[in-house]
Swiss-Prot record:
Substrate binds at D44, Y141, Y167. This is Aminopyrimidine aminohydrolase. NCBIfam families: salvage_TenA. Catalyzes an amino-pyrimidine hydrolysis reaction at the C5' of the pyrimidine moiety of thiamine compounds, a reaction that is part of a thiamine salvage pathway. Thus, catalyzes the conversion of 4-amino-5-aminomethyl-2-methylpyrimidine to 4-amino-5-hydroxymethyl-2-methylpyrimidine (HMP). Is also able to catalyze the hydrolytic cleavage of thiamine; however, this thiaminase activity may not be physiologically relevant. Therefore, is probably involved in the regeneration of the thiamine pyrimidine from thiamine degraded products present in the environment, rather than in thiamine degradation. The record marks Y47 as: Increases nucleophilicity of active site Cys. The keyword Hydrolase applies. Pathway: Cofactor biosynthesis; thiamine diphosphate biosynthesis. Its EC number is 3.5.99.2. The keyword Repeat does not apply. It comes from the Bacteria. The gene is tenA. InterPro entries: Haem_Oase-like_multi-hlx, Thiaminase-2/PQQC, Thiaminase_II, Thiamine_Salvage_TenA. Homotetramer. GO terms for molecular function: thiaminase activity.
């Protein structure tokens, strides 16, 4: 079994939990609230900006010009292509995507996720650690979306179905490239090192779950110490 497949197998329980959590279930039924969608879009805009920067940090770690070319293309996709998925949700809210994200949010779950990825990029020379931190994002979105296509709970009368349709196909290219890169880099690594990479991958899966849940709870920083009049 290739290394990437071992990672996917290990991540299955987490992905199952994400699918059963409120965000995806409400998206399937089309009953998700506008406040949750706004919070998700605002937080995701901040997340994707940093995710794009991480592609740029990966480029110097690449040995192949083909890999560099693909990463540059992915930066373009993050800036332009994925906006289509965001527009679907913005239309459900009834506001333009640009208007929604004018108000920035940086919730704890997004903060911790982004810092997890940056730590791998800055502290590990081997690109596999950064890739393992980034790869769960497109993989989980694709897995959730593909599973939805055969789920009777997917309400085709609601526009949220278009969001699932988008992610059921649009992540395939980056998933395939991340797989190939991880499998190639894993060949020269020890079992102990691969276990560390697996840990990085699974931690990102947990961060993905927390990110979706963040939207449902309208998560924000809580510093306590309320002042009583």
């Amino acid at each position: 079994m290739e290394f990437s497949q071992k990672l996917y197998q290990a991540a299955k329980p987490i992905i199952n939990d994400i699918y059963e959590d409120d965000f995806i279930q409400k998206m399937l039924s089309g009953d998700i609230g506008a406040d949750a969608l706004r919070h998700y879009l605002k937080a995701d805009a901040a997340y994707l900006k940093e995710f794009t920067n991480l592609y740029a940090l990966l480029i110097p770690k690449m040995n192949s010009m083909n890999d560099v070319k693909f990463l540059v293309e992915q930066i373009e996709f993050m800036v332009e292509g994925e906006v289509l998925a965001h527009d679907i949700l913005a239309q459900i809210v009834g506001e333009s995507y640009e208007e929604i994200i004018k108000t920035k949010v940086w919730p704890p779950s997004g903060d911790h996720y982004i810092k997890h990825m940056y730590f791998q990029a800055h502290s590990r020379e081997n690109a596999i650690y950064t890739i393992a931190a980034m790869a769960p994002c497109p993989y989980i979105y694709a897995e959730l979306a593909k599973r939805s296509q055969s789920d009777h709970k997917l309400n085709r009368e609601k526009d949220t179905a278009k969001w699932f349709d988008f992610y059921s196909t649009e992540m395939d290219d980056i998933i395939n490239v991340f797989e190939a890169l991880m499998n190639k880099l894993a060949e020269s690594m020890s079992d102990k090192e691969l276990e560390q990479v697996k840990q990085v991958f699974l931690e990102s899966c947990i961060h993905e779950r927390r990110f979706f849940n963040m939207a449902m709870t309208l998560e924000q920083w809580e510093f306590g110490g309320k002042v009583n009049d």
